[in-house]
Each structure stands twice: as C-alpha cells, then as structure tokens.
From Swiss-Prot:
Role noted for this protein: Endonuclease that specifically degrades the RNA of RNA-DNA hybrids.
Species in which this protein is naturally found: Lactobacillus helveticus (strain DPC 4571)
UniProt name for this protein: Ribonuclease HII
Keyword annotations: Cytoplasm, Endonuclease, Hydrolase, Manganese, Metal-binding, Nuclease
Chain's gene name: rnhB
GO (cellular component) term, any one: cytoplasm
C-alpha cells in the first residue's frame, strides 16, 4: 500500500485491527499519518464528550418526559439596533457537535449552524425589542420582555426554561445558569440563533444607514461607529439613553 493509499484509508472509518496493521509499517510517512490520525480522533472524542456533558441540565427534564427550552439574548451592549432573544427546544436526537457559545464561533460557522439548528430543533422562537423600547423601559427590562416574547413564540410549549443568567417573566419553572451558553446545548443553540438573526437585521439596517458600518460592528461602539456618529449624528435605531448617543439629546 502506498503512503497516498494509507492517507486515503485513514480518511475513512478504519478499525482498530486496520490501525494495528498499519502501525507495523516501518515507513516514517505512514507513522506520521497514524500519529496525526490518532490526534484527530482524540480531539473528536473530547469534543463529543464535552457536547454530551452540555446535555446534563436538559437530561433532568428529558428523563421525566418533559421538554425544556434554552433561552439567550444578544445585543445588550450596542449603541444601535434591537436586543434579540431566542428560545430553542431540542431533544435527545440533537447531534450538532459544533454547537457551542456563539461567541466562540466564527461568523461563518454560525451561519452554517443556523439553518441546521432550525431544522433539528423541536421548536424555535424569536423575540425582538427595538431601540425605542429599550430607551423607554431600560435594557434589562427590554431583555426580559424579549425573552418572554421568544418563549411565547414557540409553537410547542416547554415544561421549563434554561436561561443564561436571567429570569424570564413567564409562568414556567426556570434554571438560571451563569455563562449558560457554555453549559447547555439548548442555550448555546439559542445564542447562535439570536446572534445570526440580529446580525441579519443589522445588515438590513446598513442598507438604510450605510455610514455606520453596522455589518462590521453590529451596532457596538467601535471607532468607525463613533466617528460616524460624530459626523452624521444618530439614526432612529440608535439608543438615545446609551452614552455617547445620549450626548446628542442634551
């Protein structure tokens, strides 16, 4: 077997017996391929184990035959745009290993996972509260109301919620988890859905207000965004109660 053929074999599902045979091959090139293969397999196994561990909270409900929704938000800190929340119900068939805290994923990876989550989830709900609402009732309360909106948008009612460090104003049992998107696959899936949904909204706003660089900053106070604010002033989607936007209304 040539080294090229060994490489092709190792790109498939090989058995331990096949590996044992290959390990007898004295060629340096073959041994390097085997070491690389075993490293990749160890990495994949660790990823699978971490993924399964992030079902620990969900399993508490699944074992009772209950559904639980993960809830998360994105857009608390920006100077412009809405706060967006998502509620996602998954079950034991959910197998998207790459689902994790959205902040740990590249924009490309989030975009790849978004339709897959929508397809595999039992139900997905979205909540959106505008900059005007945020200014009216404050970001914390707008966040809570958007989370409630997302839960109510689910077409299947959950028995309980797993929430990333918040309390949602709905009549359901809740477990609040600090850094929940790193501890629960349901919350992680919700964080990805909310992030991609909000990024798309900000891309749409960029077509109306192209000066502020929303596709690059998502409404956060980057230098580009602040410079545009100084030059052009705030738009209707800017949060009037957030500094330095608030300086324009004094």
């Amino acid at each position: 077997m040539t080294i090229k053929e060994v490489k092709e074999l190792l790109s498939t599902d090989v058995t331990e017996d096949q590996l044992a045979e290959l390990e007898k091959d004295p060629r340096v090139g073959v041994q390097k391929l085997i070491i690389s293969y075993r490293k990749k397999q160890a990495k994949l196994l660790a990823k699978k184990q971490a993924f399964l561990e992030r079902f620990s909270y969900e399993k508490q409900f699944w074992q009772k035959g209950e559904l639980v929704a993960g809830v998360d938000e994105v857009g608390r800190g920006p100077l412009a745009g809405p706060v967006v929340t998502a509620a996602v119900i998954i079950d034991h068939n959910f197998d998207l290993l790459e689902v994790n805290d959205s902040k740990k994923l590249s924009p490309e990876k989030r975009l790849q996972l978004y339709p897959k989550i929508l397809s595999e989830a039992v139900s997905v709900g979205i909540g959106v509260k505008s900059a005007a609402v945020i200014d009216q009732i404050n970001i914390y309360e707008a966040d809570r109301q958007a989370m409630a909106q997302a839960v109510k948008a689910l077409d299947v009612k959950p028995n309980a919620l797993l929430v990333d460090a918040m309390n949602v104003p709905v009549d359901l049992p809740q477990i609040e988890l600090i850094k929940g998107d790193a501890k629960s696959n349901s919350i992680a899936a919700a964080s990805i859905v909310a992030k991609v949904f909000r990024d798309k909204l900000m891309d749409d706003y960029d077509k109306i207000y192209p000066q502020y660089g929303f596709p690059r900053n998502a409404g956060y106070g980057t230098k580009e965004h602040i410079d545009a604010l100084k030059k052009y002033g705030p738009t209707p989607i800017h949060r009037k109660t957030f500094a330095p936007v608030s300086d324009f209304f004094k």
